[in-house]
């Protein structure tokens, strides 16, 4: 019996474990976007300079084509507080007077026979959660797609190797050309459908993960 209990416990603990996708450098999903240049018809002007390859001093340097680079200024700050209280009380009482039989009360050793029952239950739970995050920095991203309304789909990542681990920042989302500043930057609060990921790999990142036994106590499998 003990053997089956141990096997069942191992299966439950194995079910609590999750197979998390580990990020890797040079992920093809975040590879730089190389735009396809349209064919340029040669202009028979007799000059060595072509208008299609000329750049004006007044040309807008802000990203607007597929493959252009734009810098995202990360200014993220979030704070969340949550509390929950739950209290359940339940009780019941049952009393019966002395039992009558043959015109008089039923007695045992001279004491009238009566019935009584009483029970109560009180369950109280409290939970508090407080979390705050702040992210500051810059990351350059490529323009992945230009939508029909002119909005730009961007995506990029940055890897930094520090001591015994690697840290990375990833960003994807949609921006408006109007939100791009003259120095070709856009703040992260202006990125729609933003997916900003800041994490790491290595010894330092692994030390912040919750152990498998703690995951069991924090999971829905823990009955208390």
UniProtKB/Swiss-Prot annotation:
Keywords, comma-separated and alphabetical: Bacterial flagellum, Cell outer membrane, Lipoprotein, Membrane, Palmitate, Signal
Membrane topology classification: Lipid-anchor
Signal peptide region: 1-15
Keyword Membrane: yes
One BP term from GO: bacterial-type flagellum-dependent cell motility
InterPro entries: Flag_Lring
Major site of localization recorded for this protein: membrane
Lipidation (N-palmitoyl cysteine): 16
Keyword presence, Ribosomal protein: no
Any GO CC annotation of this UniProt entry: bacterial-type flagellum basal body, distal rod, L ring
Domain of life: Bacteria
Lipid moiety-binding residues (S-diacylglycerol cysteine): 16
Compartments, record wording: Cell outer membrane; Bacterial flagellum basal body
One term of GO molecular function: cytoskeletal motor activity
Physiological role: Assembles around the rod to form the L-ring and probably protects the motor/basal body from shearing forces during rotation.
Subunit structure: The basal body constitutes a major portion of the flagellar organelle and consists of four rings (L,P,S, and M) mounted on a central rod.
Family, similarity comment: Belongs to the FlgH family.
HAMAP family in alphabetical order: FlgH (MF_00415)
Record protein name field: Flagellar L-ring protein
Organism of derivation: Shewanella amazonensis (strain ATCC BAA-1098 / SB2B)
